């Protein structure tokens, strides 16, 4: 058993008509992982588990395998992403109740220029292929400044 700070991210494809399109969101706490991984990334950085989570061994963050778009087939804004986090905490997704949106810094750790995956439109995104194809191309984050929320993109431009 390893005790680790887990960060569960929901790659949530989001869309705000007034602002921008986004596609991911996440969550944090300290829990124990009891199971063995069912799959490991080619560089051994990520481990996938049967409960629908992916562990980043470098950052000790745990992410949800599927994003909001993949699970709900719907667009969400930042407020809806936060409401969804509450719902999955209430349901104790994967046995955890401390999910949250990632910070900009945390979400940025998923972007790796040498990694390849495809988003819901079949376009190239730069996250590990252990994450299922068809996800969104960016993520909502917990970071805010006045009335603005920050997004991290996984497309060519990468980052914030």
Give the positions of each predicted feature.
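Glycine-aromatic-enriched surface loops/turns that form tight recognition elements
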Residues: 2-7, 15, 19-100, 104-160
């Amino acid at each position: 058993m390893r005790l680790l700070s887990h960060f569960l991210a929901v790659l949530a494809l989001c869309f705000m008509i007034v602002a921008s399109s986004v596609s991911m969101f996440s969550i944090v706490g300290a829990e124990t992982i009891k199971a063995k991984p069912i799959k490991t990334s080619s560089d051994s950085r990520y481990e996938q588990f049967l409960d629908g989570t992916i562990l980043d061994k470098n950052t000790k963050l745990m992410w949800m395998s599927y994003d909001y778009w993949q699970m709900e087939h719907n667009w969400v804004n930042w407020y809806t992403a936060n409401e969804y986090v509450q719902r999955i905490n209430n349901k104790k997704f994967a046995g955890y109740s401390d999910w949250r949106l990632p910070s900009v810094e945390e979400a940025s750790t998923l972007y790796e220029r040498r990694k390849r995956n495809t988003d819901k439109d079949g376009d190239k995104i730069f996250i590990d292929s252990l994450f299922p194809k068809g996800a969104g191309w960016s993520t909502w984050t917990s970071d805010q400044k006045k009335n603005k929320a920050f997004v991290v993109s996984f497309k060519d431009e990468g980052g914030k």
